[in-house]
Amino acid sequence: MADVQMAEAETFAFQAEINQLLSLIINTFYSNKEIFLRELISNASDALDKIRFESLTDKSKLDAQPELFIRLVPDKTNKTLSIIDSGVGMAKADLVNNLGTIARSGTKEFMEALQAGADVSMIGQFGVGFYSAYLVAEKVIVTTKHNDDEQYIWESQAGGSFTVTRDVDGEQLGRGTKITLFLKEDQLEYLEERRIKDLVKKHSEFISYPIYLWTEKTTEKEISDDEDDEPKKEEEGDIEEVDEDKEKEGKKKKKIKEVSHEWQLINKQKPIWLRKPEEITKEEYASFYKSLTNDWEDHLAVKHFSVEGQLEFKAILFVPKRAPFDLFDTRKKMNNIKLYVRRVFIMDNCEELIPEYLGFVKGVVDSDDLPLNISREMLQQNKILKVIRKNLVKKCIEMFNEIAENKDDYNKFYEAFSKNLKLGIHEDSQNRAKLADLLRYYSTKSGDELTSLKDYVTRMKEGQKDIYYITGESKKAVENSPFLERLKKKGYEVLFMVDAIDEYAVGQLKEYDGKKLVSATKEGLKLEDDDEEEKKKREEKKKSFENLCKIIKDILGDKVEKVVVSDRIVDSPCCLVTGEYGWTANMERIMKAQALRDSSMSSYMSSKKTMEINPDNGIMEELRKRAEADKNDKSVKDLVLLLFETALLTSGFSLDDPNTFGARIHRMLKLGLSIDEEEAGDDADMPALEEEAGEESKMEEVD
């Protein structure tokens, strides 16, 4: 084929990342090299989708080749396998850019995944499926013709460069692409008819275009001896003699073998979504899912349904076992639901078809009611599409509930897609209550198991009116939080919301099953006293600590909004709570981590903290006595500042000035170890412990 290239060849270097990828594909041993055929057929199908879509608005686009097909041609003589499609083809610029000089966003991620031990069959998910050809081929030639350009030939042995030549004398395609693989000596199995058929059945049976295989057919023919000694050559192929004589009716008969070639259709299945669900096997769903998504694993769940009535459409939805590497990449358009209109593929990244939070659901929707020539702009206004979307969301939630019936499957699903459900709680007010049923959390009573809100409600203690939760960085960070002390003592269960997105979700999910969701870290936590006597005692305690609260507020100034006696802590000396409508400590941490945050919003939403003190704690009792004896006692001030900074940490906030806090702790240690401050040589560098007073204060030991 290369001999007919009369035009001058241009040589291009592969982009560095693509070169690395090719090197990795060629020099590493992979057991499942067979996936190359799936990838190349999938690319051919995409090219056919594009030209079919273009032809909806301009019929002349199909003039050069009206038939849409994929053809496979094994050539045992030349050891080549060709994949031919009558798709959109590539112009010269596309050829240079798409096959070598511009790396896709997934190139680097795929290499990293491969080096981390991922399966090579993932290649299609990263948009670099073409290069899988080099798993079996030592050289690849791509001949392509686009309607708006001449025919070109791309050729490479993957040695760091490729050539592109204008095809002057080669066989003209009309329109489309022909990929010729020059197979390695140890990969000649892919020229066998049986092997190719098996691979198409396994990976590409549900491609919606006919796949034809150029097959060899041998037939035996009986001729009598008195027919021409020299058998005529049939148009179809060669004839070879079989040395076998047979007497029949007194005449000598001969058998000859006749070899002919023909195109054989090898994907005869009609679109799977048009068949009845009860007729389809589990294996067929798995095969369709893999051909649809390029996933190498089976799906986790499937929902196959049709909607009839005023509006009719059929759909198959799948939930994968894993989240893709770029699930929340905003630059990537989600293209997981393919939209067909009367069996004609229209588009695969229709944002109006499914909400963003369900972007991980893959599948096919085929409608009879949408117009064939629908444009993106029309889709946004289309009422039919809004009804389809509503139905898809409903069916997705049904499918998730079906997964939830199997605990192990649901754990897999929740680990991969819990963020999506929580994003749904935040965005989809209509389905918020249904999505809330799907949430799972660890809690003070669930141990290592996740619990649902429904199960939490069934375990609520008598007299408990609200659902309690705490947000934080991790389960470990919240399970021993001072905020939980009284709740635990009263036997109330508290949910641990330790995912950053929980803060956003719970902000929208105000209640569940008629019960309010109440944060353990915010103001307004009302816990009823067990009896009147206890209530009376608490009131007396509060009264006796009123003066200390005032002194602490004077010392801390505008660091806190107010200081009150706590109802929520039992053992800790104090804690810091936030306003009912402001950010929690955890939300403040999340917002500080946002590089592009609006700082004016931060100052508005990070509400003033309220310091709550525990009247039953020994430290607080001693502090009260000292403050009452001498409210100007400098050790009281130092202790209050130290308690405040410690409470910041235990309540989940960060310190504005960790150095001062460190110095305060060191001072405390010296007192405990009876080290005289005058003797410590490095003390000169220590910051003053009180910001307001310039003079140094010496701490007294607290019993």
Swiss-Prot record:
Residues 677-694 have a biased composition (Acidic residues). ATP binds at residues 43, 85, 130, 376. SMART domains: HATPase_c (SM00387). Its main location: cytoplasm. Keywords: ATP-binding, Chaperone, Cytoplasm, Nucleotide-binding, Stress response. GO terms for cellular component: cytoplasm. Residues 220-253, 677-703 are annotated as: Disordered. Gene3D superfamilies: 3.30.230.80, 3.40.50.11260, Heat shock protein 90, C-terminal domain (1.20.120.790), Histidine kinase-like ATPase, C-terminal domain (3.30.565.10). Molecular chaperone that promotes the maturation, structural maintenance and proper regulation of specific target proteins involved for instance in cell cycle control and signal transduction. Undergoes a functional cycle that is linked to its ATPase activity. This cycle probably induces conformational changes in the client proteins, thereby causing their activation. Interacts dynamically with various co-chaperones that modulate its substrate recognition, ATPase cycle and chaperone function. This is Heat shock protein 83. It comes from Ipomoea nil. The gene is HSP83A.
